[in-house]
Amino acid sequence: MGLHPGVLGIGNAYLGAAFAGVIKVSSRHAEIITRIRMLRTLTLTMVNRVKNVKVLFGLNAISAWLGFGGSFIVNTFDLVPEGEVEPHLFGPHAPGMSGALTRIIDLFGYFTIWSNLLVAVTITMLFLNPNKSSQRFKLFRNTSLLMILMTGILYHLLIAPTANPESWNIYTNALQHYITPAITVLVWLLVGPRKWFSLRMTISVFAIPTAYLIYTFARGAIIDRYPYGFFDVIEYGYVSVGTTLVMIYIAGYVLALLFLALDKVLSRNK
């Protein structure tokens, strides 16, 4: 006995609706699967980026700590005999452990040590927590960038032509004045952090360098010794040294503005 055409029509309608529902559910399911896959890909990308960022921060930290730590050990244990000391510069020191304390005190009188130590501390903190972003930390991080770049430039222009490092100092000198400055700037260019520079920050980053200069010249006035020849007010006078410092500040501010400009450009391309 055949089915009534009306029944067949109703059945076909139900089947059609059922198939449409299945197709709709399948489409929705496929969309959910696609979104899950996209989220997974994005998550893996972020995880890999964090890993790569930490690797770069880690290498930067190793370089900075090696340079600073090497100098600290060399000076503590007097591993490199002290050569002839120029008038009004740090030294001479007693040989061996008897002169360890004065050597370490003088060691912390160098801008190179301040900049490398600041890089070592800030980059290690970024390695431990790449998302660290307090305003104070941003200031320290950006200051370390400017100071380490100035360290490399000033050493190359004003000190390297007459410098003659020996023994272990050859390696610590290369690390602190060439390798760490280059790595630090390169890592910043590659992975930031971004959007940390502002016009106000280009002024704030001079707080620590200025504190260093105040300490250096106050101490120098007491002991008649300075870390660098171009700081020697006894030999060259305050006007000449002051002029040099003004030129250094101007050059430093130009570099700070360059960091600001690069930060804005790299933030847009991120």
Question: How would you name each of these model-derived features?
Answer:
Residues 13, 18-20, 29:
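Residue-level detector of structural "landmarks"
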Residues 50-55, 223-259:
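Membrane-interface transmembrane-helix boundary segments in multi-pass integral membrane proteins
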Residues 63-84:
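Alpha-helical transmembrane segments of multi-pass membrane proteins
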Residues 80-104:
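Perimembrane loop-to-helix junctions flanking transmembrane segments
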Residues 113, 170-182:
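Membrane-interface loop-to-helix entry segments
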Residues 129-140, 192-200:
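Membrane-interface helix-boundary motifs at transmembrane edges
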Residues 156-165:
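Juxtamembrane "helix-exit" motif on the non-cytosolic side of transmembrane helices
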Residues 181-197:
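Alpha-helical transmembrane segments in multipass membrane proteins, preferentially the mid-helix core
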